[in-house]
Each structure stands twice: as C-alpha cells, then as structure tokens.
Amino acid sequence: MNVEINGSPILTTLPIFGGIPLTATLVVTWSIMLLLTLFCIWLTHDLRVDHVTTRQTVAEFLVYTAQNFVDSNMGTRFSHYAPFVAAIFSLSLLSSLSGLLGVFSPTADLSTELAWAVLVFVLITATKIKTNGIGGYLKGYTQPIAVLTPFNIISEIATPISMAFRHFGNIVSGTVISTLIYAALGAASHALFGLLPGAVGDLLSRIPFLSVGIPAVFSLYFDWFSSFMQAFIFCMLTMMYIAAAAEAD
C-alpha cells in the first residue's frame, strides 16, 4: 500500500520578477473568492421593499446570521466586523471542502492559514493602538513588570502562529486519515476478492469495491463536519482576540 501526500503543486511560473511560481493554492483560492463575490452580487442585486424574492430572503437571512453571530460574541459595538468574519468563515469552509472536487485544498497549505492569521494579528494590533494609543500599546509589553517584556512579545507573536498551525494541523490530519482509510480499504478489497479462485478472483481483486461508499461515511466527519468546525473555531478565536484587544489596559 503506497500512500503519498504532497504539498501544493506548482502549475506554472510567471515570467516576471525573476519568475513567480503559480501554485494550485493561489489558483483555487482566487477561484473561490471570485465565486463568493459573484454569489454575493447575484444575491443582493435588485433588492426590494415589497414583493421580496426568495433570493433576497436568503441574502437577508445570511446577513442576519453573520450580524447576530458577531454581536452575540463581540458586542454590538463590533458590528462592523460582521462582513470580515463572514468572509473568513466562507473562505475557510469552501477552501476545505474544495478538496472533495479533486482539486488541491488551500487550507492544506500552511501559507493560507498564516496569511489569515497575519491579517487577524494586524487587526488585533490596530485595535489595541486605537484603544490605548501608541504609548499605552508599547507600555502593555512591560506589564506587570519590565523583565517580562521579552515573554510578552513572544506571547503576542505566538497568537497568530498558534491560530494558523491549529487550523492547518486539523485539516491536514483529517486529510491524512481519510487517505489512509481509503488506501486501507483498497488493499483490503484486493486481498479479500483475491481469495476467489481463477480469473474471477483476479478480475474482482483489481476493483476496489470497499473503497466505494464506505469512505463517504468517514467523509461526513473528516471533510464536512471538520471543515465547518475549523472555520467556526478560527472565527471564534478571531472575535475573541479582537474583542479582548479593545479592553483598555
């Protein structure tokens, strides 16, 4: 049983700035963002006050859900973060589920989660500076005593890194387990039907019967449920850190 798991493949190299590799992560991520943008435009065009369409009802439901999600976890003064949280959640969920279509999942590439985490880190830092000012923000690194400054800096940097690795680790571990289960069922099918005598056994042993249907059961968790939970947890951590950063020191 040979199992091989690789990183994001390089599709081509753009002949600019000495050659920029165009990876599957970039292509799939931008494709998902384009589809999300077109979907939002389709949902929100031709909005009405009377004779509301089903499309508008769905759009209002999604907006209300995102707004309520942010308000209930961060407070109403952070309502303006609802579009950002909804975008991160949608992008994370669809990026993880894109692997079901046979393309490379962007969330299986650590650079994707690191980019999101850096963006969240910038928002956290900006919120702290807005709340306490530059002086108060820098002074916060010396609390409660100045000797802890290096540890406070490390703790600050560790926040986005831990968010990225937690999300990446859970997605990749699910991919690895699903791949191992699929490969093991294929090997078991080959061994089981190979016990049949003659040409019938030789023919049936080449068809991975056990790999059809059974992996779908595990996919409900490792692909669908896990993808939803990882997107949900990443958004929860984002809201928690930003809300905490808005508290005056």
Locate predicted features:
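Selective transmembrane helix interface/packing segments
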Residues: 1-249
